Design a protein with these regions (language model features):
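Extreme N-terminal starter segment of soluble prokaryotic enzymes
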Residues: 1-3
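Short N-terminal binding/cap micro-motifs at the start of the first secondary-structure element
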Residues: 11-17, 42-44
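Glycine-rich beta-strand-centered segment in the early N-terminal region that forms part
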Residues: 22-39, 49-92
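NAD(P)H dinucleotide-binding glycine-rich loop of Rossmann-like/cofactor-binding domains
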Residues: 85-147
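N-terminal Rossmann NAD(P)H-binding glycine-rich loop of SDR-like oxidoreductase domains
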Residues: 149, 157
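Hydrophobic/small residue at the entry helix of a nucleotide-binding pocket
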Residues: 152
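Adenosine-nucleotide cofactor-binding segment
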Residues: 161-191
Length: 191
């Protein structure tokens, strides 16, 4: 049986317990993933602390990378041995192995390491949503980006810069200003 970080009550980091969990064979349209890396995000803290309550006991974690170990009936988009990533869906990425719906997986390109993928999937979806759906940003526009030196902010700086957008980023220290500028932010406001 694989081990997983499980919470039985909401609270601080001390509520996380490393436990063996039962794991069945993949059902229809599911795959069994051997996790290699896990993304750490604020949503995990919110779930653990109860800001976003979970039915307990529960594992936490919304972003992971791994290798397909086995597939259930009807799975055609991935095969055993594929390197994959996933984000969102049912919490539970803080684990050695897990079942996951095959249609929510993405195959990872060779140039992207497992560590890079696990650290960028949720942030990348967030940036894409903000600059494509919330407001379709176009070349020549100016964007004010709060927390420009955070995980989402640094990715947004790069993406917006690539689109030809003038990026003004808010930061809280001179070091963060330097980091934001190094990632494509044109100007910073240090508050």
């Amino acid at each position: 049986m694989p081990n997983s970080i499980v919470i039985h009550k909401h609270g601080g980091p001390e509520v996380m317990k490393w436990e063996e969990i039962p794991l069945q064979n993949p059902g229809r349209s599911e795959v069994l993933i051997n996790q290699t890396k896990v993304g750490l995000n604020f949503i995990d803290i919110y779930q653990r602390s109860g800001v976003y309550p979970l039915d307990l006991p529960s594992s936490i974690g919304m972003e992971g990378v791994g290798v397909v170990e086995s597939i259930g009936e009807g799975v055609e988009n991935v095969k055993v041995g594929d390197r994959i990533g996933y984000v969102m869906g049912t919490p539970g990425s803080y684990t050695e192995s897990r079942l996951y719906p095959a249609d929510r997986l993405i195959k990872l390109p060779e140039f992207l390491s497992d560590s890079q993928a696990a650290g960028v999937l949720l942030k990348g979806l967030t940036v894409s949503y903000l600059i494509n759906r919330t407001f379709a940003v176009e070349k020549g526009q100016t964007v004010l980006l709060h927390a420009a030196a955070g995980g989402v902010g640094l990715l947004a700086c790069q993406w917006l810069n690539r689109l030809g957008v003038e990026v003004i980023g808010t930061v809280s220290t001179d070091e963060k200003a330097e980091r934001a500028i190094a990632h494509g932010c044109n100007h910073t406001v240090n508050y």
